[in-house]
């Protein structure tokens, strides 16, 4: 099993449990250059809020898009947008990525901005 297949297997197991619980998810996807976050409804059919380092508003705030500072900016933005839609509690879906570095920075910033998980 290669590295990507193992990550997808871990992500699938976690997502199955979150769907079983019926929780609104904060989904994170990470690439070497960017980080993306989406708040997805409990049904899995609707994206309630999204933020990423591809957006010009976040690119203006950070010098580089592939580091922990950029991830923290995305975390703050996604929390603000989710709270504006009335979402206060989410389940953190790290998509099989290790809870470390940029993923942890995004989570910490989202918690600091008022999102509960």
UniProtKB/Swiss-Prot annotation:
Keyword Heme attributed: no
The species this protein was found in: Tolumonas auensis (strain DSM 9187 / NBRC 110442 / TA 4)
Protein name (record): Large ribosomal subunit protein uL18
GO biological process: translation
Keyword rRNA-binding listed: yes
UniProt keyword terms in alphabetical order: Ribonucleoprotein, Ribosomal protein, RNA-binding, rRNA-binding
CDD domains attached to this UniProt entry: Ribosomal_L18_L5e
HAMAP family per UniProt: Ribosomal_uL18_B
Family: Belongs to the universal ribosomal protein uL18 family.
A family per Pfam: Ribosomal_L18p
InterPro entries (alphabetical): Ribosomal_uL18_bac-type (IPR004389), Ribosomal_uL18_bac/euk (IPR005484)
Functional note: This is one of the proteins that bind and probably mediate the attachment of the 5S RNA into the large ribosomal subunit, where it forms part of the central protuberance.
